[in-house]
Regions:
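Glycine-rich portal/gate segments that line the openings of hydrophobic small-molecule binding cavities
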Residues: 45-94, 150, 154-163
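Intrinsic-disorder/low-complexity, polar/charged segments enriched in Ser/Thr/Lys/Arg/Asp/Glu/Gln
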Residues: 7-13, 56, 75, 88, ...
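A conserved amphipathic terminal alpha-helix motif
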Residues: 117, 121-163
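A generic structural micro-feature
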Residues: 4-6, 51, 70-74, 97-101, ...
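Hydrophobic/aromatic beta-strand elements that line small-molecule binding cavities or substrate pockets
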Residues: 12-14, 75-82, 93-95, 103-111
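A short, structured loop/turn motif at beta-sheet edges
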Residues: 17-21, 49-51, 81-88, 108-117
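Hydrophobic ligand-binding cavity/cleft-lining segments
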Residues: 1-53
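Beta-strand elements of well-folded, non-transmembrane domains
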Residues: 18, 63-65, 124-126
Length: 163
């Protein structure tokens, strides 16, 4: 069940016509994150497929697509904070800024008849006070989360039909 959206959390859902294991496999691969990004910020990824809480990988970023902060190219470390195989994966991002921001991205997967109900969420309720006062959240809009789910659906479906 989708939690109601708050001013500090966005959730969107989409049914993807693939098994939860196929969707989860895609989300566990750092390169999969780059493939499905609708924001245009994720440029590449380095790291192994994640297998549990505490695993990390590097994402190469460029905020030019958002046209908000001229940071140029930079890297962030993604740390997995929730990992329940074929059910949920979530992570936080750490970059050069301090204090660390503390926003969380994640996916909940629920098997439905012949498919997977995927909930994508973006939660900034636990960010540090300095970031709350900065007024820059949410970085990613509800529309961007919806678009990412569309790309995920297309990507997982394409992967399943070509394997």
């Amino acid at each position: 069940m989708v939690k109601p959206m708050t001013v500090e959390r966005i959730e969107v859902q989409r049914t993807i016509h693939a098994a939860p294991s196929s969707v989860f496999q895609f989300l566990s691969d750092p390169k999969g994150h780059v493939t499905i990004d609708s924001s245009g910020m994720l440029m590449g990824a380095d790291g192994d497929v994640v297998t549990g809480v505490g695993d990390t990988f590097i994402i190469h970023m460029d905020r030019e697509a958002l046209n908000d902060y001229p940071l140029g190219l930079y890297d962030v470390i993604v740390t997995i904070t929730k990992f329940v195989e074929d059910r949920e994966i979530a992570w936080t991002v750490a970059g050069l800024v301090r204090p660390s921001i503390g926003h969380v991205y994640g996916y909940l997967l629920e098997p439905v008849e012949g498919a997977t109900l995927v909930t994508s969420y973006y939660d900034w309720s636990s960010i540090s006070p300095e970031w709350k006062e900065a007024g820059v959240f949410p970085v990613i809009s509800e529309a961007a989360l919806r678009a990412t789910l569309g790309i995920l659906s297309r990507s997982v479906t394409r992967t399943n039909t070509t394997s």
